[in-house]
Amino acid sequence: GNAEEAFLTGKRIGEAMREMGLNYDLAPVVDVESVCGNPAIGSRSFGTDAATVTRFGAEMARGIQAAGVMACAKHFPGHGGTNVDTHKSLPTITLSMEELEAGPLVPFYAAIEAGVKSIMTTHIMFPALDKEYPGTLSGAVLSALLRGKMRYGGIIITDCLEMGAIASRYGAAEAALLAAKAGADMPLISHSYNEAARAAELISRAIERGEMNMPEHNAALGRIAGAKEWLSMQ
């Protein structure tokens, strides 16, 4: 295939979603499948080399958004380098910063350049970036790298916090607070309403106690409002 086909496929998907009343597609997957047999990514990846994934991922994001649907590049900073399934366990990827820059991060740079409206985080340890917290809960990954070095101004959404990699260690609601403090705009709890409500309560209490960085919190609210405004104009 070619990049134009990726754009057209994304556009068709976006158009079909709009016909069904949907406006947010948690795609494309821009993980480079550098480890074969990856159970969480597998055939969802565009390929095993960064150049291919970069080309197709950016164009698919453009296509989805050309149809008036928000796209989401995932899973930052890269889920392709492990065969551990984050739905069950917490993996570690031991790439250096230089190796990350040369491989897994390349498609994300391209997606940002393409104007992707959101980026989803991954529940993986990257010791080169943060020895204590996985990507989803790491200020070094979300604020310093994605917001700072990569200059990303769109929405950061987490992967589902009820997945085994996170819930079994932190609890989903507690992780939502940690993710928000680390720089996530939209902590995602996709199964349990009660757990989502508890997460909202924990974040509200943290605000009341002065534990949140309020300029950053307000900036997150502004990014979400901006996305809603963009969608309303489509």
PLM region descriptions:
Residues 47, 175-176, 229-234:
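Short, charged low-complexity intrinsically disordered segments located at boundaries
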Residues 9-10, 179, 224:
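Short alpha-helical scaffolding segments that buttress acidic/His motifs in well-ordered protein cores
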Residues 1-22, 29-50, 57, 61:
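A substrate-binding/cap region within the structured catalytic cores of diverse enzymes
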Residues 205-234:
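Mid-to-C-terminal alpha-helical segments outside catalytic/metal-binding sites
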Residues 48-216:
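Second-shell residues forming the walls of enzyme active-site clefts
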Residues 37, 83, 229-233:
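Secretory-pathway/luminal and periplasmic proteins that interact with or process carbohydrate-rich
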Residues 26-32, 72-77:
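Short, surface-exposed recognition loops or helix-turn segments adjacent to catalytic cores
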